[in-house]
Design a protein with these regions (language model features):
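Terminal ABC-like ATPase head and other globular end-domains that cap long coiled-coil arms
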Residues: 1-173
């Protein structure tokens, strides 16, 4: 009986080790691809440099992930030290990096362009337009460049009587 339990224990420990190894390999594959995507996309959006850094490279599940970014003509910063617009661009670069690795069927963004200046809104709108060939985007925005890049526009207005008017138009109409 003890021998049987001992063998079963060894089998279970071997399976656990196998799955832990598989988990680590899958993570490293995903992290490597997403990290490369992030560096490229961040450079496209900001003309700067950015990279993803694991807090504990030996055991990535024991720590977190940090963004080390250098927007054009600025010093290297962590995410917490960036302006609102720089944080938005960094976060969107990360989302787009994951999207390129494993696309989702649709994305819902609520005023992601709020903290951005006009030229950055145009860059984000252009990137979303390109990615929209693979995934659908539902975006709430008040910014003209984002609205102008849409295939369909839904306007929502509150009337004086507090009721809501919803109108749909095709872009370019």
């Amino acid at each position: 009986m003890v021998e049987v339990l001992s063998r079963e224990r060894e089998t279970i420990l071997e399976r656990i080790a196998y799955f832990e190894k598989q988990k680590l390999e899958a993570f490293r594959t995903a992290f490597s691809a997403i990290s490369e995507n992030f560096s490229r996309i961040f450079a496209t959006l900001t003309s700067g440099t950015g990279r993803l850094v694991l807090e504990c490279d030996d055991d990535p599940f024991a720590g977190g992930l940090t963004f080390e970014v250098q927007p054009r003509d600025k010093a290297v910063h962590l995410l917490s030290a960036l302006s609102g617009g720089e944080k938005s661009l960094t976060t969107l670069a990360f989302i787009f990096s994951m999207q390129q690795f494993l696309p989702a069927p649709f994305y819902a963004f609520d005023e992601v362009d709020m903290s951005l200046d006009g030229s950055n809104v145009e860059r984000i709108a252009s990137m979303i337009r390109t990615i929209a060939a693979e995934s659908q985007f539902i975006i709430v925005s008040l910014r003209k460049p984002m609205i102008e890049s849409a295939d369909r526009i839904v306007g929502v207005t509150v009337r004086p009587d507090k009721s809501t008017l919803v109108t749909g138009v095709r872009a370019g109409d």
